């Protein structure tokens, strides 16, 4: 049985979205057990799953405006902290939260702990592409600054994730840069390029540009945390803007526009689904001793369900265990 600790009080739509997502996941997957950490009185009205769900009551929670490290240290009974402690103690195999990202990173680093020889765990998420396959990108903001060595480790971690969780054989690894030529980039990117191209265990395809990311140019894209977070926000914002503009044009375009939209409804639905990052799950703080996954703060029940499904796959394929073995002896 795979045990997943859920911070039921984190996020904009907590606890309703978290609990409703849990209801669906428990109904669909018979091999998971959920530990819900939070205010029992607020959780129970939404809980329909009677089996394999246990509520661990606490009224303390970490707010979105709390200082991350301070909150983790001072709010020892917060739902997020208790979920992380359950993972560390072996009472749960993984944890999920839609709460304060910085606090979750701190809980992952200081409570769950890093895999030996991984210097900086990175935040990894599967991003949408036009072709529908998507690509895994890290780091998406766990670290503001990185070295070339960190980027090399991210390439290995990303390859492990793409191959084991998403089933991609020999995933293509690209280094995000301001040009595709090997001579492009600042000293960080140039040094990282040398490390990646010299690693025969990676299917490194070279530099990739941001404009090509959604065209299935690579399966894994490596970036420093600052750049990766900026790209993530750009992709999210662009997807929302495109769908918003389409809706505005259809509603304001009169009868012909509405008729055209009706005729194209299947195609438009496909476009919407291809840009929906929530269906892929959450962002994994990869490089820790157990899966710690952050779902978007505004996640609905569907996104929470998708994240639980993602965690289940991570546990089923033992991607973290394989990463531990890979890094048990430092490669560099």
From Swiss-Prot:
Lineage per the UniProt record: Bacteria, Bacillati, Bacillota, Bacilli, Lactobacillales
Family affiliation: Belongs to the PlsX family.
GO molecular function: phosphate:acyl-[acyl carrier protein] acyltransferase activity
Listed PANTHER family: FATTY ACID/PHOSPHOLIPID SYNTHESIS PROTEIN PLSX, PHOSPHATE ACYLTRANSFERASE
Main location: cytoplasm
Location relative to the cell: Cytoplasm
SUPFAM superfamilies reported in the protein's UniProt record: Isocitrate/Isopropylmalate dehydrogenase-like
InterPro entries in UniProt: FA_synthesis, Phospholipid_synth_PlsX-like
UniProt organism field: Streptococcus sanguinis (strain SK36)
GO terms of biological process kind: fatty acid biosynthetic process; phospholipid biosynthetic process
Assigned keywords, A-Z: Cytoplasm, Lipid biosynthesis, Lipid metabolism, Phospholipid biosynthesis, Phospholipid metabolism, Transferase
Function: Catalyzes the reversible formation of acyl-phosphate (acyl-PO(4)) from acyl-[acyl-carrier-protein] (acyl-ACP). This enzyme utilizes acyl-ACP as fatty acyl donor, but not acyl-CoA.
Subunit comment: Homodimer. Probably interacts with PlsY.
EC number: 2.3.1.274
Top EC category: transferase
Gene3D superfamilies: Isopropylmalate Dehydrogenase
Name under which the protein is recorded: Phosphate acyltransferase
Record-level GO cellular component terms: cytoplasm
NCBIfam families: plsX
Recorded metabolic or biological pathway in which this protein acts: Lipid metabolism; phospholipid metabolism
Highest taxon above the source species: Bacteria
């Amino acid at each position: 049985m795979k045990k997943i600790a859920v911070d039921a009080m984190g996020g904009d739509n907590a606890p309703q979205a978290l609990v409703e997502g849990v209801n669906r996941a428990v109904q669909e997957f018979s091999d998971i057990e959920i530990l819900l950490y939070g205010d029992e009185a607020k959780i129970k009205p939404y809980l329909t799953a009677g089996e394999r769900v246990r509520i661990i009551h606490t009224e303390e929670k970490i707010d979105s405006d709390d200082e991350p490290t301070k909150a983790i240290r001072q709010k020892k009974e917060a739902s997020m902290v208790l979920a992380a402690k359950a993972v560390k103690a072996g009472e749960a195999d993984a944890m999920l939260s839609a709460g304060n990202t910085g606090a979750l990173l701190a809980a992952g680093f200081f409570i769950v702990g890093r895999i030996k020889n991984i210097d900086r765990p990175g935040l990894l998420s599967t991003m949408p592409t036009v072709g529908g396959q998507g690509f895994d990108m890290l780091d998406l903001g766990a670290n503001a600054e990185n070295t070339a060595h960190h980027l090399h480790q991210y390439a290995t971690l990303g390859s492990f994730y793409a191959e084991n969780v998403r089933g991609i054989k020999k995933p293509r690894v690209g280094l995000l840069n301001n040009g595709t030529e090997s001579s492009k980039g600042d000293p960080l990117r140039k040094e990282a390029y040398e490390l990646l191209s010299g690693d025969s265990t990676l299917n490194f395809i070279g530099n990739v540009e941001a404009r090509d990311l959604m065209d299935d140019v690579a399966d894994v894209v490596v970036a420093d945390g600052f750049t990766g977070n900026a790209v993530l926000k750009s992709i999210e914002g662009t997807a929302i803007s495109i769908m918003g503009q389409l809706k505005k044009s259809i509603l304001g375009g009169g009868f012909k526009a509405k008729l055209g939209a009706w005729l194209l409804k299947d195609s438009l639905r496909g476009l919407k689904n291809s840009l929906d990052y929530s269906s892929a799950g959450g962002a994994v703080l990869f490089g820790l001793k157990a899966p710690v996954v952050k779902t978007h703060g505004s996640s609905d029940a569907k996104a929470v369900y998708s994240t639980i499904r993602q965690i289940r796959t991570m546990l089923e394929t033992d991607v973290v265990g394989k990463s531990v073995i890979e890094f048990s002896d430092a490669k560099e």
